[in-house]
């Protein structure tokens, strides 16, 4: 069994990116810059953004965090985004979710200039993904999954892939990326009947449902590759959507939780920020 070590791979990729960023800065005198916006005092949001700030510093990308009070109105937030859209020194914009209930998430996402939409959530980037447009900013977690498969030499062309979970953030975009990579893809969701009949046929199984230990050994094909996107808190520990202990001896390769997909998400955010800077300054 191969352990797909996202933490180690992420470290290697950041070192590669740091070299690229340094060369880019030397040749253009432009420093890529990411601005992250937090609305309110959600502790998890602050932790996530702090880790993104730290990662930016490691590769030579500038970052700025703007923290707004909980009572910030939607129009005030949209006005700030408009200012950042028109600031040529800012290349990438991230609004940390969740937002307070009185702010419409879609209005906020749609207001970010597609070329600065580092999360890849804007409808323009979603459409570009479908069309295989090279200017597409791909959503960070799905992009990280594809990078893991590629870096570990796991072939997608001709593979039968089952994605469990159909969210806009992971399930749908990773399904599209896999289609683009010439895989045959089945996307399962909560209305899928007889889920096991699908998962046991998968050469590659990707799980993103937010249910601890949801995938058990009897749901996985012998010799499959399993990518566990889940992050669940159980009895003070972080566990995935896959019962790792039961599944690991049955599969060819598997991601751990923590230390699998999670670190790759932040690394791809850095790569997207660099892509934003390059595209905006062509």
Curated annotation (Swiss-Prot):
Transmembrane segments: none annotated. The keyword Protein biosynthesis does not apply. PANTHER family: C-1-TETRAHYDROFOLATE SYNTHASE, CYTOPLASMIC, C-1-TETRAHYDROFOLATE SYNTHASE, CYTOPLASMIC-RELATED. The gene is folD. Keywords: Amino-acid biosynthesis, Histidine biosynthesis, Hydrolase, Methionine biosynthesis, Multifunctional enzyme, NADP, One-carbon metabolism, Oxidoreductase, Purine biosynthesis. CDD domains: NAD_bind_m-THF_DH_Cyclohyd (cd01080). This is Bifunctional protein FolD. One of its GO terms (biological process) is L-histidine biosynthetic process. GO terms for cellular component: cytosol. It comes from Francisella tularensis subsp. holarctica (strain LVS).
């Amino acid at each position: 069994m191969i352990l797909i070590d996202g933490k180690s791979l992420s470290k290697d990729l950041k070192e590669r990116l740091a070299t690229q960023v340094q060369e880019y800065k030397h040749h253009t005198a432009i420093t890529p810059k990411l601005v992250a916006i937090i609305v309110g005092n959600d502790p998890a949001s602050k932790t996530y953004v702090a880790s993104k700030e730290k990662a930016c510093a490691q590769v030579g990308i500038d970052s700025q965090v703007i923290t707004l009070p909980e009572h910030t109105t939607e129009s005030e937030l949209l006005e700030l985004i408009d200012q950042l859209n028109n600031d040529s020194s800012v290349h990438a914009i991230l609004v940390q979710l969740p937002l307070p209930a009185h702010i419409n998430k879609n209005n906020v996402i749609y207001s970010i200039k597609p070329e600065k939409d580092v999360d890849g959530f804007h409808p323009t980037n979603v459409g570009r993904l479908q069309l295989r447009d090279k200017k597409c900013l791909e959503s960070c977690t799905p992009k990280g999954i594809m990078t893991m498969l590629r870096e570990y030499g796991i072939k997608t062309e001709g593979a039968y892939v089952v994605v469990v979970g159909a969210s806009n953030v992971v399930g749908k975009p990773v399904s599209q990326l896999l289609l683009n990579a010439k895989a045959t893809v089945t996307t399962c969701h909560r209305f899928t009947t007889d889920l096991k009949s699908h998962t046991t046929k998968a050469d590659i199984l990707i799980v993103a449902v937010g249910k601890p230990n949801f995938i058990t050994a009897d749901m996985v094909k012998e010799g499959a590759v399993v990518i566990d996107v889940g992050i669940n808190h159980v009895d003070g520990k972080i566990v995935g959507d896959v019962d790792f202990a039961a599944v690991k001896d049955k599969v060819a390769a598997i991601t751990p939780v923590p230390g699998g997909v999670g670190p790759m998400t932040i690394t791809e955010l850095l790569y997207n920020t660099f892509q934003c800077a390059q595209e905006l300054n062509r």
